[in-house]
From Swiss-Prot:
PANTHER family: PTHR48408, XYLOSE ISOMERASE. It comes from the Bacteria. Keywords: Carbohydrate metabolism, Cytoplasm, Isomerase, Magnesium, Metal-binding, Xylose metabolism. It is an enzyme of class 5 (isomerase). The gene is xylA. Its cofactor is Mg(2+). Its EC number is 5.3.1.5. This is Xylose isomerase. Homotetramer. Belongs to the xylose isomerase family. The active site is at H100, D103. GO terms for biological process: D-xylose metabolic process. It holds the Pfam family AP_endonuc_2. Mg(2+) 1 binds at E231, E267, D295, D338.
Amino acid sequence: MSYFEHIPEIRYEGPQSDNPLAYRHYDKSKKVLGKTLEEHLRIAVCYWHTFVWPGVDIFGQGTFRRPWQQAGDAMERARQKADSAFEFFSKLGTPYYTFHDTDVSPEGSSLKEYSENFLRITDYLARKQEDTGIKLLWGTANLFSHPRYAAGAATSPDPEVFAFAATQVRHALDATQRLGGDNYVLWGGREGYDTLLNTDLMRERDQLARFLHMVVDHAHKIGFKGSLLIEPKPQEPTKHQYDYDVATVHGFLLQHGLEKEIRVNIEANHATLAGHSFHHEIATAYALGIFGSVDANRGDPQNGWDTDQFPNSVEELTLAFYEILKHGGFTTGGMNFDSKVRRQSVDPEDLFYGHIGAIDNLALAVERAAVLIENDRLDQFKRQRYAGWDADFGRKILSGDYSLSTLATDALARGLNPQHASGHQELMENIVNQAIYSGR
């Protein structure tokens, strides 16, 4: 059965095309800085928003009537969901996908049933991957939707909940390994608190650290060669989450000896919820040595929650890719669309429109970021701005040759009277805009 029979394969037709079911900028074989756009982007489509979400919100019921969600038997629905997903991936021409365990497989009424269902669906997904050549960017476990996780999973006050969550992660990590996934993601959706009045903060942080060590140990045990990634988010659904932002995650990893084992998966909308730019979080992750992968989406500046809209700002994406390309590009990570169509976008075509537009925006951003790297004007100015630190005096300060006292004595002896030099922010912004809008 075809779920998108009337939709053709999406192909590149160039900027002049008026075909809404074609790429205008994403020519996957086009080379930029020595790699194809497909290699730079490593695009993935997520299972949950695209094939699971029924179009509900807190004020209304689901608006979507997806044909793959109609079968009476839960396992048959799971197989139909996989059929529709891989047909979609194939027509869109995207090389990767991502999932939560309960996106792809029915949870069942017991842990035993959950495990059996998941094993069977993993085999089914393996066959779909073999038939299509589509690969798994990352897998994860849903440790936030079921009522048992209302007070958290690893941070739950109930050790039985912790154990249930550990079982899910064990199976999800095993499935990711079985399917050749490049990463495994840990999103602490309810690893946080709603009020400190009933929360033992230190205990919960220790529990979370123990859980992460168990995950790392299991990954080593099964020979998982991919990256383990935490996805930071400041709040929602809890008031405060322990993986607030990239810097917070890094501090937690350092505290618990995990900084060499786990990196971050950065979501654009989570960055803005934390009061940061997408650019900031990516740059911070690279500065701290924990950059892993990206969830591509955007929020609404007028809304204080995670709207998971498709990314449509080439300006924002260019700055993100400027950081990524400067550091050599993705290794195991990629660009996963943690994005969903709006509740009113009920036609099957809308799923394609959202992804096509976003993929075109990513392609443009890679090309514009490459211009910034090739003309080198931003980095050239930075090198000039910090040149004093590369000279003898600056190097001696950083190498520890001076104490606070001897540096003060030297400053007095030199009669230092430094004058401020312009930061040229406006010029830097003009250089970025010239690259984006003029391509040079």
